Curated annotation (Swiss-Prot):
Pathway terms, separated by semicolons: Lipid metabolism; fatty acid biosynthesis
Job description of the protein: Involved in the final reduction of the elongation cycle of fatty acid synthesis (FAS II). Catalyzes the reduction of a carbon-carbon double bond in an enoyl moiety that is covalently linked to an acyl carrier protein (ACP).
Positions that bind substrate: Y227
Protein name (database record): Enoyl-[acyl-carrier-protein] reductase [NADH]
Binding residue positions for NAD(+): 49-54, 75-76, 112-113, 141-142, 246, 276-278
Single GO MF annotation: NAD binding
Organism: Pseudomonas putida (strain GB-1)
Amino acid sequence: MAIIHPKVRGFICTTTHPKGCELNVRDQIEATRKLGVREDGPKKVLVIGASSGYGLAARITAAFGFKADTLGVFFEKPGTETKAGTAGWYNSAAFDKFAKAEGLYSKSINGDAFSDEARAKVIELIKNEMGGKVDLVIYSLASPVRKLPQTGEVIRSALKPIGEPYKSTAIDTNKDTIIEASIEPATEQEIADTVTVMGGQDWQLWIDALAGANVLAEGARTVAFSYIGSDITWPIYWHGALGQAKQDLDETALRLDQKLADEVKGGANVAVLKSVVTQASSAIPVMPLYLSMVFKIMQEKGIHEGTQNQLDRMYRDRMYRADGAPADVDEKGRLRLDDWELRDDVQTACKALWPQVTTENLFELTDYAGYKKQFLNLFGFERADVNYDEDVATDVKFDCIEL
């Protein structure tokens, strides 16, 4: 038991609130349920990177929008008697509790999703507990490091531009001030390493392993999540080291799509999602300012979406359409869920607003207050229905295998 308040260091909140996290998950489940439960669609789903952000939302839509059995893989820190674990641990515990209450199969693996050990354990569980096959594999890993399974070598990714140093207006989120951020370009090695960590290699290893073990159902699909963003963030993102990794992901999708079409009459896509507040996005310089602006503009236009709305739209309007029609894809075969964010009217408004923002008018011109609240929400804080001065149980156990 502990009384827990937020402690923010840099772009990380070092504390989490178990009750707040549980209520966040409950709200996401309710949002999905409101759209109705479908009888068709995926029924046995593996989510790699299932504990927060888009991966968690994908697991929630599968379970509570389509009554699917789910297996989730993630790397989180459990809580102890005296110390809280990570938000993803409590998110997953809450998901497990609500899924089991519905009579759905829910199992989780806490370990390194980049490891062969994790793949072997997943295959064993699919064979022994999930009827032998899965029909959807969601790949949603966001990690700054990857340990290569063959050699044990640890590779790190770099959030850097390519070629030129990147200079831009940004928010110092610790002081709530507007600053000039400057980031030196990535070296060739850093670019290559970023592709190794965040590109399609591990996704390919997963699908190869699952296909090799014959645990992919007829018609099985796989989706990996990506972000392209607007040209405002391109120097640091799409045209930076991370963009190279995401282009590698695109190329991997084309290979996997062919493979799955040939082997199980299935398919693979990259899904390009909109920018949202996640632990991953808050680490990207310029993102907090861009998010604060684009949220305000999209809210004014009535087209703002959170993580759960995006995934509900991906499943219901793209992958598993009620009319059975194939999903709309772009010229690279990608599912585009960033279509509303990238509308001309939204981006033009962003570009007009960008040079006007100062420390003095930051809260007035943008939804930076909303950004800050959503950031703390990720860790279970800033909820009106939680008393943060009360003791809360931190040692939460659930149906999770520790690797």
